[in-house]
Amino acid sequence: VPKNDHGPFSHEGEQYWGPVNWDNGGMEHTTLHLLYSRFWHKFLYDIGVVHTKEPYAKRTSHGMILGQNPHYVGNVSTQEEKDALIAKYGNQALRPAVKMVKTLGNVVNPDDVVKAYGADTMRLYIMFIGDFEKVATWSDDAVKGCKRFLDRVWNLADQVTEEDGVSEKNAPIVHKTIKKVTDDIDTLKMNTAIAALLTMVNEFYSNGLRRGHFEALLRMPSPFAPP
């Protein structure tokens, strides 16, 4: 076990390893763990043990994925049924989506999704569900849509010609999509990056595609659905 008789940790080690480059967490992480980690780090900074005021060079917070609300008034047809739900569940009955909890039976098991649609579909949908930092509602229909997109990419292989490079007809959409996906990944806009890929695939089905088009298409979704 390493020992240091001169301080809580090595000054050289702290200079090398700190601060954390990027810390990400949900809202509960932000209001609980982050509060204490910053408090202790600022204390250590005040007594001269660490060299930065903040423990993290960059901080982001992702949104929560909600589940369907089984007690939502929109699930019933008569006013009497709606009034009964409001009387029993209050304002919660007015929200179509709520936090996933076992007692409501609205928890989505990732293993079930992977078994039904594959891991690539699961990863792609989580990135496509909405803006990184905002709340989003899980949708089984949207999961199926992501699976259809991956199937369309797979089926494009049958339409690839033996010509190399990129045709003049497809060059604009290919280069535009490469830039869009690159920029969006850098700014955590995964959903709009994937939307651009959907558009490009539609163009390929309309215009036909060469080997160069298909190679570009297979590279761009790699962060979401590795080949």
Name every feature range the model reports, one short phrase each.
Residues R219-P227:
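Short, intrinsically disordered, charge-balanced linker/junction segments flanking boundaries
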